């Protein structure tokens, strides 16, 4: 599922709401360097962004006519009669996802070929024209109900590009798309996420479409106000690759440089969408060098997406190419463990079931994670901070509480005396992002009986940071916060052991 790099950050329409929540701030010419850093430290996620970050792992179900043609991208000319999953079981999909630790799933309700997995009133190119359940089936309903049954979130992917729609490339298509979006947002209960990608190819008439994103966002906020709008939307950005690997330094607070500041300040509703200047897929998005010349700053966290297979749709010939549990674990460390949310695609097969190869990999992946994180060797440790308060809160297993420094200190040292000597090689850190993302550099050292030895070091933390390092046996350690934007707000600290 390749994306055209048209990463659209449509943020200004809901600025008035964001301003109250603190996930957006305007920068003024007289702010100065310290003022800008202070403002950056106070940008925080909206409630919907916080809820989504706490999910950590979400799932994708790519399913449609491509499943039956062997394609990744269809043509829009597929005969709906080819869609006939003989054993479709959405409960199986969702249960397998939940058992793997996935907290929310997204279904491709319509991919670029235009085939709709629900009986839409807008087009004949849908499940209603297929032999599946004699045209009475509704995949969106099945998955929605399964998510409710198993207690996980449900989201929809709706491709703006539609190779089948005759009016694509005209103003009428935006009306058509709004009708489809309205059906999905109105008839299937709570929708937790709407996922748009940036593909914008030609329709049947050879024309491309000017997407009315501002209108779509307004509709989503009206009909499903708690839903996040991802990728081509204001709440979540694409990390920039489909490998599952995030940046070493991942800031959720990033610049926006082409706002009409006056219009936003006055609450104008005329400019509902804008494209940010700069590359949202670059290697550095939120460092001091990047934010210092910005016009505004916004909380715009990263999503890291990858498929469990080489392709996004199911292909039988890829059954022996499913990612290994060990590879999935490495992806987890480099996505969730780098301040991102992992979106893992698990495509159902032609029968309408998750393949056994995928199931086996997912089960073992969950076991590997459970084995690592079942015991925090720092639990019940004695903590002493050089210049802060509530150091013990970093061991309370609550990401809403935190240690912070006194006065204006932006650095700190927390000494950790374990109950007994322990063997560990994984560090987990979390900030209380309700207070913003602040920590810029940290280091973990252990006492070998003679001197302090470096075990691990890193830059940004955000919601979660995981670092693997050479195995250490120690009883005394110290965590050094070396740089922070204002007072650091460290929520959690953990030491774990991973078999290598």
Question: For the regions a protein language model found, what residue spans apply to each?
Answer:
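Extracellular Ig-like/FN3 beta-sandwich strand-entry sites
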Residues: 472-474
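Inter-blade boundary loops/turns of WD-repeat beta-propellers
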Residues: 432, 447-449, 498
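Mature catalytic domains of secreted/periplasmic carbohydrate-active enzymes
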Residues: 20-408, 415-417, 423-430, 437, ...
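Asp-box/BNR beta-propeller loop motif
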Residues: 1-4, 447-454
């Amino acid at each position: 599922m390749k994306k055209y790099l048209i990463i659209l950050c449509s943020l200004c329409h809901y600025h008035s709401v964001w301003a109250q929540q603190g996930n957006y701030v305007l920068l003024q010419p007289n702010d100065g360097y310290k003022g800008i850093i202070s403002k950056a430290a106070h940008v925080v996620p909206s409630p919907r962004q916080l809820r989504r970050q706490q999910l950590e792992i979400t799932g994708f179900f790519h399913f449609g006519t491509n499943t039956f043609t062997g394609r990744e991208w269809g043509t829009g000319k597929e005969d709906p009669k080819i869609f006939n999953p003989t054993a479709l079981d959405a409960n199986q999909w969702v249960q397998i996802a939940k058992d793997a630790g996935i907290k929310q799933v997204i279904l491709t309700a319509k991919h670029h070929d235009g085939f709709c997995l629900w009986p839409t009133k807008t087009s004949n190119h849908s499940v209603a024209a297929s032999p599946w359940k004699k045209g009475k089936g509704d995949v969106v309903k099945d998955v929605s109900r399964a998510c409710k049954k198993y207690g996980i979130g449900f989201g929809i992917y709706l491709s703006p590009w539609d190779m089948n729609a005759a009016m694509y490339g005209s103003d009428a298509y935006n009306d058509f798309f709004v009708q489809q979006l309205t059906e999905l947002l109105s008839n299937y209960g709570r929708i937790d996420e709407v996922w748009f990608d940036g593909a914008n190819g030609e329709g049947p008439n050879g024309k491309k479409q000017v997407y009315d994103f501002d209108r779509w966002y307004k509709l989503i906020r009206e009909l499903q106000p708690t839903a996040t709008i991802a990728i081509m939307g204001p709440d979540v950005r694409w990390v920039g690759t489909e490998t599952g690997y995030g940046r070493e330094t991942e800031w959720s607070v990033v610049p926006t440089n082409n706002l009409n500041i006056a219009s936003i300040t006055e609450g104008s509703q005329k400019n509902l969408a804008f494209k940010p200047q700069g590359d949202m897929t670059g290697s550095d998005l939120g460092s001091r060098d990047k934010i210092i010349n910005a016009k505004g700053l916004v909380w715009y966290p990263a999503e890291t997406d990858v498929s469990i297979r080489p392709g996004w749709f199911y292909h039988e010939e890829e059954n022996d190419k499913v990612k290994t549990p060990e590879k999935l674990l490495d992806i987890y460390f480099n996505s969730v463990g780098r301040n991102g949310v992992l979106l893992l695609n698990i495509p159902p097969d032609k029968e309408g079931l998750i393949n056994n190869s995928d199931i086996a990999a997912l089960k073992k992946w969950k076991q590997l994670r459970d084995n690592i994180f079942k015991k925090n060797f720092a639990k019940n440790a004695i903590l002493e901070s050089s210049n802060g308060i509530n150091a013990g809160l970093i061991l309370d297993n609550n990401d809403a509480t935190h240690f912070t420094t006194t006065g204006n200190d932006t650095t700190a040292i927390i000494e950790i005396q374990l109950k007994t000597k322990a063997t560990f090689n994984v560090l987990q850190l979390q900030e209380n992002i309700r207070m913003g993302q602040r920590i810029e550099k940290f280091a973990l050292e252990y006492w070998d009986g003679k001197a302090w030895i470096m075990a691990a070091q890193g830059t940004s933390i955000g919601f979660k940071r995981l670092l693997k390092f050479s195995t250490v046996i120690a009883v005394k350690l110290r965590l050094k916060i070396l740089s922070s934007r204002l007072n650091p707000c460290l929520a959690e600290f953990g030491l774990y052991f991973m078999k290598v």
